[in-house]
Amino acid sequence: MFVMSSSSIPNGIFIIDGQERYVNPEGDVESNKSERTSKASMVFQMCEKQCRDENGFKCHCMSESHQRQMQVLGQNPTRVVNGYSQEFEQTFLDLMRRSHRFSRVAATVVYNEYINDRLHVHMNSTKWATLTEFIKYLGKTAEEEKQEREIQKQIERASAGCEGKDVVVDDDDNDDDEKKKDEDFRLKKVGFALGLGVKERGESSKLVFGDEENDKVERGDKRKRSALDELMKEEEKKKERMNRKDYWLFEGIIVKGVVKRVIDKYVGEIEMLESKHVLRVDQVELKTVLPQIGGMVKIVNGAYRGSNTRLLDLDTEKFCAKVQIEKGVYDGRVIKSIEYEDICKLA
């Protein structure tokens, strides 16, 4: 073994006592190279193999075991990725339950604790590219589960409810308080007074096309609509606003004649059915025509403007029709109530 002054000792690797040693600028002898580079720089999740450097990476890629694992991955990559994703999610949530069950903590803190495990599933092996995407996925999943629970509670209240009584359920957005909610859940009694006489309930009325009408009697507080119903209703209103126009002429519809051509949206060239004469008429002078039940009609105004549909039924009292869309994005959708003025017979 030899000794040099600290001022003259360079930074490098020397053979000391027959072993490869690293000498830093301060003159301290550190452990050998293999110990200094023990931290893996490359990890194969499928092979559960860690490589320290580029040479080890190349050697492993050429090995037979790696080729077999790549063949397994190529046969069904979706199943493999989903498997790692489920394992990552389960382990991440288990760590949260154990370490941060009753506290609010940042996702990065939990993730840093998670990756301390040398055998953890790496994020690159899952279907989430970043931790942010994974957290958004957890939030979305929790929201869907909450909606399902809300819908199930509404069904139970509708089945078990009776006139004059209501089941009051307090919803809490915090999943950590599930046990507390279950303990505090109680059925509250609602006081009510009857008048001198009670009107007997008649037979339930029918809807336009033979469907039984649901009981619409108010029982105190109005029931909350599910988020899905609200979204669907808003989407219908948006489409109605966008497609509701003050003109409705389309080529190929029958209006006591056949519209051969539409001019400036409001004027059409009409071919008379009997005389075959062609006239130019403003839409104010025209009226829509309805075929027999089962005939084809075009929706000329409203949310589904331009769609070809089949006439299923008519309600002469409310001047509405029931149609089913054929072809297109909304193929098969049934519109239970649409006004006569919004549909017209196809030629």
Swiss-Prot record:
Give the principal location in a single coarse category: cytoplasm
Q: Where in the cell is it found?
A: Cytoplasm; Nucleus
Entry keyword set:
Cytoplasm, Nucleus
Question: Which Pfam families is this protein grouped with?
Answer: C2H2-zf_KIN17, KN17_SH3, SH3_KIN17_C, WH_KIN17
Q: Where is this motif: Nuclear localization signal (NLS)?
A: 222-225
Gene3D superfamilies to which the protein is assigned, alphabetical: 2.30.30.140, 2.30.30.30, DNA/RNA-binding protein Kin17, conserved domain (1.10.10.2030)
Q: Does the keyword Nucleus apply?
A: yes
Its cellular-component GO annotations read:
cytoplasm; nucleus
Question: SMART domains attached here?
Answer: Kin17_mid (SM01253)
The record's similarity note reads: Belongs to the KIN17 family.
Q: What does this protein do?
A: May act as repressor of root growth during copper excess and of hypocotyl growth in the dark.
Query: What protein does this entry describe?
Result: KIN17-like protein KLP
Q: Which gene is this protein's source?
A: KLP
